[in-house]
UniProtKB/Swiss-Prot annotation:
ADP binds at residues 153-160. This is Putative phosphoenolpyruvate synthase regulatory protein. Keywords: Kinase, Nucleotide-binding, Serine/threonine-protein kinase, Transferase. It comes from Paracidovorax citrulli (strain AAC00-1) (Acidovorax citrulli). InterPro entries: Kinase-pyrophosphorylase (IPR005177), PSRP (IPR026530). Its EC number is 2.7.11.33, 2.7.4.28. It catalyses: [pyruvate, water dikinase] + ADP = [pyruvate, water dikinase]-phosphate + AMP + H(+); [pyruvate, water dikinase]-phosphate + phosphate + H(+) = [pyruvate, water dikinase] + diphosphate.
């Protein structure tokens, strides 16, 4: 497998450059070494970044790959004219054609989160994160009427990371509840969830994968035993079918794929904004 150092340079956090760059790199069978250089917003910082890139090129004998999301043209020019890496200017690639199509100049505003802390979207997102943390793993039954989505599934099926992703990325208030042996004995959902059935979405997972995950946490326990995992998954899926709950398997899906599927099923309007 090929290895290569990849730089993500931005005058903001670098998250956009890294996300976009990783999506492209995933198409190649390489093992990249990631270096994120955020807040490169002055010419002095640009020269420092160039020195680091060029040192890496000399040390490794290969051109580093450099993804940039820089809106300050003087900073970008220093990188373009001096770095010994393969430069992929993401903003330049898309902004100039868009300026031509829209017939207006871009704002060239540094940092896509400028003034975000004052926006309603930001406030709503913080509230969603707090709600999801308070309602993680069945900790609280309060204010379930305020939930956008309620996730259910056996322990370690992916409920918590999915809840937090939906809160942080989509601003959704998400509660999640583990289905436990007492629920299986009653053959019913937890009583607190019944009034909110329309908001419920189920997560399941292959027993073999569940056993593997649980063994990392509690090796050799009944909790992680494959037979027990098979029993819990079968009972949970049967309960979801009886209750008419929509559900999916998380076994081979990323958090992003799980969250998008839930949005499509439960809150499709949130895909349009």
């Amino acid at each position: 497998m090929h290895t290569r150092t990849v730089f993500f340079i931005s005058d903001g956090t670098g998250i956009t450059a890294e996300t976009f760059g990783n999506a492209i790199l995933a198409q190649f069978d390489i093992k990249p070494r990631h270096v994120r250089l955020p807040f490169i917003d002055t010419e002095d910082k640009a020269h420092q970044a160039v020195r680091r890139i060029n040192h890496t090129a000399e040390l490794e004998g290969k051109k580093p790959i450099v993804f940039t999301t820089l809106v300050n043209m003087s900073v970008l020019r220093i990188i373009q004219e001096n770095c010994q890496g393969m430069l992929l200017d993401m903003f330049g690639t898309f902004i100039r054609p868009l300026e031509g199509e829209l017939g207006i100049k871009s704002l060239h505003r540094v940092g896509r989160f400028a003034d975000v802390s004052l926006s309603k979207e930001y406030t709503d997102r913080i509230e969603a994160i707090n709600f999801s943390l308070d309602h993680d793993d069945g900790q609280s039954h309060r204010d379930l009427s305020g939930a956008d989505v309620i996730l259910v599934g056996v322990s370690r099926s992916g409920k918590t990371p999915t809840s937090l992703y939906l809160a942080m990325q989509c601003g959704l208030k998400v509660a999640n509840y583990p289905l436990i042996p007492e629920d299986f004995e009653r053959k019913q959902l937890p009583p607190a969830l019944e009034p909110h059935r329309k908001k419920i979405f189920g997560l399941t997972i292959l027993p073999e994968r569940l056993s593997q995950i649980r063994n990392e946490r509690r090796p050799g326990s009944k909790y992680a035993d494959l037979a027990n995992c098979r029993h819990e998954v079968a009972e949970a899926e049967a309960m979801m079918r009886r209750s008419g709950i929509r559900w999916l398997s998380t076994t081979t899906k990323s958090i992003e794929e799980i969250a998008t599927t839930i949005l499509q099923e439960v809150r499709p309007e949130r895909l349009v904004y």
